[in-house]
Amino acid sequence: RPADIPSLCLLLREAYAAHIPVIILGMGSNVLLPDGVFGGILIITRDLRNIEINGTKATAECGASLNSLILRCAAADLGGLELLYGIPASVGGAAYMNAGAHGVSFGTSVLCLEAYDPRTDRIVTLSNEELAYAYRKSALQAQSTLAVTRLTLSLNPTPEDVIRARIREVVHRRALSQPLALPSAGSAFLRPCESLEVWRLVDACGLRGYRVGGAAVSEKHAGFIVNCGGATARDVRLLMDHIRAAVLARHGVTLIPEICIFE
């Protein structure tokens, strides 16, 4: 757990020079790590959580939680991200995958982003245009060596009480629709298109509650895979494979994992 950005860069530089594989995690959401021993370095960025507000802009380090950022912005009467409240992501992870909910995408608010490149031992700055945000996508996903360090967001002046009312509504909706009582990696698959919801496709295959080992399709929301106890990465992968095969056979739709799977 690096204590600051220079320490993170040093660790990444030395790992790259020694050809040691690295996995970087913020909050660990939407990630499936391999079973057994990982033969590399696992970096946790949660101590890199500084947030600064300047006018209508907020700058946050990669390990800051998305919820903390939203609340800090709310206290400064800055909105735009509040519908994302409750997503258990770090700021870096949200930027990497373009986290979204309720029609709002994180990337829309990103003004620019700093990322360390161990190949050149430099921190590069990428504009919103260069990040090429799309549905759950960013240019970062094609740049395997870049590590997000800090980013700046452009926000909208909004009264704090309005923001907090929206947050309360989002929290209520999540509690009603999502399996928050059980561990999960979040939404298992990307929505194939705007008109197709994954949970409906899975439900039509009769897979709600279907189980492989300790992993199961959530009874509450068929778009989630939950850990009912003792689930392994293999359980989750086998269940995802079964779901994909069933949906393809019934609907002719190929589901793409939203979970980032490390082999």
Language model region names:
Residues 1-91:
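Anion-binding (especially nucleotide phosphate/pyrophosphate-binding) glycine-rich loop
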Residues 27-29, 40-41, 64, 87-94, ...:
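Gly/Ser/Thr-rich helix-start
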Residues 74-76, 80-112, 184:
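A gly/ser-rich beta-alpha-beta helix-loop segment of oxidoreductase catalytic cores
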